[in-house]
């Protein structure tokens, strides 16, 4: 295996076949316009769009608030267990086509329970999709419940209470939604309560929020992973700490570009993260809205920042090493990455 960059055509074939995991993907953010339209018709919901093309045009936003508006509007078509199953299965089919072997998907129960959908409906539907994906596609998955940080700590505790009958089916909890003004400290108690129940803890930090939020996430909340983490690079001591502790960063390049976290992909910090020894991974975040699933994120970023073959293999290995699989499963998956790289 050489450390030379390679032609985009060769890299696409190589990266598609490379075993890899996705650790940062919001299932509600994988709702494609076609499925939104189909579910609206199925459930008798009137959308402010006359066609799939009009929905797709609405997906062309340029800021976080416009994205959140269409995101929550889209979630409103998810009503039944079958809807959530279809949503999950559609994502896993795309992941499998991209060479994804494992995913740890986020879901936002408050987005659904606040509009009268039962927590159990969401869980039953998503789990059915996950089970079918494993049986028919060979893709394994885990589920991470996210608390919406623009809502209250009290609301998060209510959601955790609703989740208690489902603990065996949940790998962890996370924090998502509007970051600025809602530091990890706001949810420190509910995240500790979640950890006490045996759940892993992750948090979005350092996407729009300052490095101080990343410090809070690792020192106060004691997260198992940082979701995004780009702005950690502004603080040398924080970067050194993340390297020393080997904390995985679930980086989302095309999301950063779409939401103007970077002005262009060629200045994205992913390559610098790897060069500094950070445990960075590549992920799609909200792929239906941000212009690309897992493979597109790998290929677009590799081309823009000059990732080498070894960089790409490292990213794939990091994705399994940073997962919530067992140590034995991680070792098996990483060995599969190494075997593939050696054979190709």
UniProtKB/Swiss-Prot annotation:
Gene Ontology BP term (one): adenine catabolic process
Residues at which Zn(2+) binds: 24, 26, 204, 285
Identification of the protein by name: Adenine deaminase
The protein's Enzyme Commission number: 3.5.4.2
SUPFAM superfamilies cross-referenced by the UniProt entry: Metallo-dependent hydrolases
Keyword Hydrolase: yes
GO molecular function: adenine deaminase activity; zinc ion binding
């Amino acid at each position: 295996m050489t450390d030379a960059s390679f032609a985009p055509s060769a890299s696409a074939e190589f990266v598609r076949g490379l075993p890899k995991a996705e650790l940062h993907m919001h299932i509600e953010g994988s709702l494609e316009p076609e499925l939104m339209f189909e579910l609206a018709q199925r459930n008798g919901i009137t959308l402010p769009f006359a066609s799939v093309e009009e929905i797709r045009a609405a997906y062309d936003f340029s800021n976080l608030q416009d994205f959140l508006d269409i995101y929550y509007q889209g979630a409103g078509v998810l009503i039944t267990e079958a809807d959530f199953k279809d949503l999950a299965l559609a994502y896993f089919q795309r992941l499998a086509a991209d060479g994804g072997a494992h995913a740890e998907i986020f879901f936002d129960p408050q987005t659904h329970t606040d509009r009268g959908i039962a927590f159990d409906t969401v869980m039953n539907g998503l789990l059915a999709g996950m089970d079918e994906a494993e049986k028919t596609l060979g893709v394994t998955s885990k589920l991470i419940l996210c608390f919406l940080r623009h809502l209250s700590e009290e609301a998060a505790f209510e959601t955790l209470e609703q989740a208690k009958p489902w603990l065996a089916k949940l790998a962890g909890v996370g924090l998502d939604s509007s970051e600025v003004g809602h530091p990890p400290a706001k949810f420190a108690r509910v995240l500790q309560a979640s950890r006490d129940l045996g759940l892993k803890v992750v948090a979005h930090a350092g996407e729009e929020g300052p490095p101080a939020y990343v410090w809070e996430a690792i020192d106060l909340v004691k997260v198992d992973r940082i979701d995004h983490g780009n702005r950690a690079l502004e603080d040398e001591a924080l970067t050194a700490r993340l390297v020393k502790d080997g904390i995985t960063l679930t980086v989302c390049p095309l999301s950063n570009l779409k939401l103007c976290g970077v002005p262009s992909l060629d200045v994205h910090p992913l390559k610098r993260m790897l060069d500094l020894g950070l445990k960075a991974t590549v992920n799609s975040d909200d792929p239906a809205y941000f212009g690309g699933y897992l493979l597109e994120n790998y290929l677009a970023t590799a081309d823009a920042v000059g990732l080498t073959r070894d960089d790409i293999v490292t990213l794939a290995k990091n994705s399994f090493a940073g997962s919530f699989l067992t140590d034995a499963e991680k070792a098996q998956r990483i060995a599969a990455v190494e075997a593939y790289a050696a054979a190709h």
